[in-house]
Amino acid sequence: TQAGIEDPRKELAMAEVHDCFTPTEMILMEDLGFCEKGNGGEFLASGATRPGGNLPVNTHGGMLSHCHPGNPGAIFGLTEAIRQYRGEAKERQLAHLEHTLLHAQGGIMSSHATVVLGRAN
């Protein structure tokens, strides 16, 4: 990939995704390569995306529990990633951050943007 990530589950410390509706997070887990197609529900139910899981997702709570302002909602994921990197995420703080995936979408899943953040060497 352009970011050099070959195995997202092993190489990403966390992900912030645009979970605007209940099935969206499940679909994104599959489309972003975190699990096989058709296994998104099982992957989420496994606890892998919860705090303490091997790929915490939406550590700030996500749009479904935080708020859903529409397309500008992606800024919440960016803000959370910055807080995590700075060590300012309080009870949500993750121990080891190397790479973080941020995802945004709009137009009813027709437009997507994904970026991978990492620490400077």
Predicted regions mapped to residue ranges:
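Claisen-condensing/thiolase-fold acyl-transfer catalytic domains that form or cleave C-C bonds
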Residues: 1-121
